[in-house]
Amino acid sequence: MKKVLATIGFFCVTPLALAQNAPPVQEITKQIIKSAQGYANAISCPGVVITPKEIAALTPYKTLDDRMDAKYAVLWDGDIGCAGGSGTSGTNISIVTVSIGDSFVVDPHTSSPIIQFESPVRSVSRIVGNTRDTLILEGKEFADNDPNCCPSITVRFTLRVDDKGNWKLVEKKLLPAKK
């Protein structure tokens, strides 16, 4: 009887042990940056630096059971193909997923340059918010007489991912000038 109870207890506790928590957020962030930065520097001019504020958790990694569903959008500025010249650098997107063995990898089929990232600005200044399929971003557009280096009109815009993985502009609004 004791063996039967011990066996039942084992099978009751085992699923709880398997539904372990994900690594700490700091470790997840570190691995996302490492993966996205390696990808960005491989396809663009070297020197791309990614920080935690450029990551949006589309589907966060919370437990070992949901890690294969985890998805992160990472924005980075770079010149894909290292074409050079003014105006060739801009904001790009990499989609980082979690693979077997807790490997964080960029999915090139859902990342720049394969997909379209319809940002109305050359450089995104911040991620305002996100859902599983939208990004709300801010950046600056060029006024008529702005030099190529320095856009001056602040805009907030929303991109939504379509069924092909392209990030399409669905809304844009001007923000009041800061005084």
Task: Show where each model-derived region lies.
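Sec-dependent N-terminal signal peptides
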Residues: 4-14
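Sec/Tat signal peptide C-region and signal peptidase I cleavage site
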Residues: 15-19
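Exposed acidic/polar residues on beta-strands and adjacent loops within beta-sheet cores, strongest
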Residues: 20-179
